[in-house]
Swiss-Prot record:
SUPFAM superfamilies: C-terminal domain of RNA polymerase alpha subunit, Insert subdomain of RNA polymerase alpha subunit, RBP11-like subunits of RNA polymerase. One of its GO terms (molecular function) is protein dimerization activity. InterPro entries: DNA-dir_RNA_pol_insert, DNA-dir_RNA_pol_RpoA/D/Rpb3, DNA-dir_RpoA, RBP11-like, RNAP_asu_C, RNApol_insert_sf. This is DNA-directed RNA polymerase subunit alpha. It catalyses: RNA(n) + a ribonucleoside 5'-triphosphate = RNA(n+1) + diphosphate. Residues 248-334 are annotated as: Alpha C-terminal domain (alpha-CTD). Transmembrane segments: none annotated. Residues 1-234 are annotated as: Alpha N-terminal domain (alpha-NTD).
Length: 334
């Protein structure tokens, strides 16, 4: 087999073996020496952290105000019930949130199959046990579902959500990942006379909401999209310039007239060729006070108006002004 010196051998054989409905083994070969660990470790980390999934994120149980309590007629306490809710394997199609209900009277076992399903929501492990009810036991709850990636503890979501949460609505640490276990190993492979090649073997187990081979494809796609940014480093400078221009806050491109300043303040700014908010915020207080007819009262007015938009004096902007902005000034003044 003749290959160019700088040409890397690409894998030509991919084998997917289903061990069970939730377990699979994927073999990829041949790989250049060292690429087995490079790709195996990257895919493993992505599979565990970045494959999207659905999970129960909140529960509201009738008669329960907090998780450190028990329910009459239910063998498990509330903490155990919440732990069992985390084990429900869900699929949500074409939606990011859903609310389901569960109502059951004892005696008997409460399972995920007792949950009343909404459209586009599927439970793949209906036999999963949630609680056990005695003869007079009764369990009624409302469950909020959400989509996400990886693991999100309650503390992380509380910081981004409103604190005005009704008493009795219990938040759960959410494990959105449909991947339960991933392991990889690198074996020796041979291609004609070369015996130093790698064979990558990935073994993974899912919760049943995603096929193992599909999860591998998703992980590879994520890795490819992330590495694309490094490939684009070889592009021309215009690509980099355009991306930097997109980072400019749109409010900075608005004329100072949009700030609704007094006529005196607005005229003083225009006399100094300050037409846009992006021009204004780059001036310091000392510079503005040197403007004819602009006193401390006008300066205070300008500072207060900028503060109401989250801006301040003396800010520095890269790539300002953006191309074409001054051309618009000329057209407007002409």
């Amino acid at each position: 087999m003749q290959t160019k010196v700088n040409e890397l051998l690409k894998p030509r054989h991919i084998e997917v073996t289903s061990v069970s409905d939730r377990q699979a083994k994927v073999v990829l070969e041949p790989l250049e020496r060292g690429f087995g660990h490079t790709l195996g470790n990257a895919l493993r980390r992505i599979l565990l952290s970045s494959i999207p999934g659905a999970a129960v994120v909140e529960a509201e149980i009738e008669g329960v105000l907090h998780e450190y309590t028990s329910i009459e007629g239910v063998q498990e306490d509330v903490v155990d019930i919440l732990l069992n809710l985390k084990g429900i394997a869900l699929r949500m199609h074409n939606r990011d949130e859903a609310t389901l209900t569960l109502k059951k009277k004892g005696p008997g076992v409460v399972t995920a199959g007792d949950i009343t399903l909404d459209h586009d929501v599927e439970i793949v492990n209906p036999e999963h046990v949630i609680a056990h009810l005695t003869k007079n036991g009764e369990l009624s709850m409302s469950l909020k579902l959400g989509r996400g990636r990886g693991y999100q503890p309650v503390t992380a979501r509380r910081s981004s959500e409103s604190e005005d949460r009704p008493i009795g609505r219990l938040m759960l640490d959410a494990s959105f990942s449909p991947i339960r276990r991933v392991a990889y190993k690198v074996e020796s492979a041979r291609v004609e006379q070369r015996t130093d090649m790698d064979r990558l073997v990935i073994e993974l187990e899912t919760n049943g909401t995603v096929e193992a081979d599909d999860a591998i494809r998703q992980a590879a796609g994520i890795l490819q999209s992330q590495l694309a940014a490094f490939v684009e480093l070889q592009g021309d400078e215009s690509t980099v310039t355009e991306s930097k221009q997109m980072e400019i806050d749109p409010i900075l491109l608005r004329p100072v007239d949009d700030l609704e300043l007094t006529v005196r303040s607005a005229n003083c700014l225009k006399a100094e060729n300050i037409y846009y908010i992006g021009d204004l915020i780059q001036r310091t207080e000392v510079e503005l006070l040197k403007t004819p007819n602009l006193g401390k009262k006008s300066l205070t007015e300008i500072k207060d108006v900028l503060a109401s938009h989250g801006l301040s004096m003396g800010m520095r902007l890269e790539n300002w002004p953006p191309p074409g902005l001054k051309d618009q000034d000329k057209k407007a003044s002409g």
